[in-house]
């Protein structure tokens, strides 16, 4: 049986944690930052976790993670 291919875009976006979850970066912190408040930008800075509803999709994209 052939190997399952990893979705390369997902491999670059998600990192697996020791507990089995996946870390991800928050959106809306790339450009057009002048109109966003400092508080909003600060809260977007730390890594987020993939929600339970999306976890199955991420696991399917990363079969060897």
Swiss-Prot record:
PROSITE patterns: RIBOSOMAL_L35 (PS00936). The keyword Ribonucleoprotein applies. One of its GO terms (biological process) is translation. It comes from the Bacteria. InterPro entries: Ribosomal_bL35, Ribosomal_bL35-like, Ribosomal_bL35_CS, Ribosomal_bL35_sf. Gene3D superfamilies: 4.10.410.60. Belongs to the bacterial ribosomal protein bL35 family. This is Large ribosomal subunit protein bL35. It comes from Pectobacterium atrosepticum (strain SCRI 1043 / ATCC BAA-672).
């Amino acid at each position: 049986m052939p190997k399952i291919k990893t979705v390369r875009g997902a491999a670059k976006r998600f990192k697996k944690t020791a507990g089995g979850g996946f870390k991800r970066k928050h959106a809306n912190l790339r450009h057009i930052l002048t109109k966003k408040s400092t508080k909003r930008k600060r809260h977007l800075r730390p890594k987020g976790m993939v929600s339970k509803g999306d976890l199955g999709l991420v696991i399917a994209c990363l079969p060897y993670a």
